[in-house]
Amino acid sequence: MKVLVVVALLVTLISYSSSEGIDDLEADELLSLMANEQTRKECIPKHHECTSNKHGCCRGHLFKYKCQCTTVVTQSGEETEGCFCGTPPHHKAAELVVGFGKKIFG
């Protein structure tokens, strides 16, 4: 059990460090991102529809939300695709481990 917790914590830390791409940007890239601040403010919040913009989801506490799509069948039998911004299961598990670690280690 301890090994599983340690492995999960390591995976979480690696995933978190790889998702923090802004920290690794050079100064020029950071300035261009700051110029596009308006675009970043218009990201799609969690649980909102992202069918037309699948890469526009906002960031959560640790990770960026992902656009998750499902096929919806209407009463008339038509199949349509419905997408929403949400947290993938493996990110939920990582956030749970990090939260648990923060409670234990302060």
UniProtKB/Swiss-Prot annotation:
User: What tissues contain this protein?
Assistant: Expressed by the venom gland.
Q: Which residues form the propeptide?
A: 20-40
* Localization per record: Secreted
Tell me the domain of life: Eukaryota
UniProt keyword annotations, A-Z? Disulfide bond, Knottin, Secreted, Signal, Toxin
List where this protein forms a coiled coil: none
Here the disulfide bonds are C43-C58, C50-C67, C57-C85, C69-C83
Which PROSITE patterns does the entry mention? Answer: SPIDER_CSTX
Family indicated by similarity: Belongs to the neurotoxin 19 (CSTX) family. 03 subfamily.
Q: In its UniProt entry, what is this protein called?
A: U1-lycotoxin-Ls1z
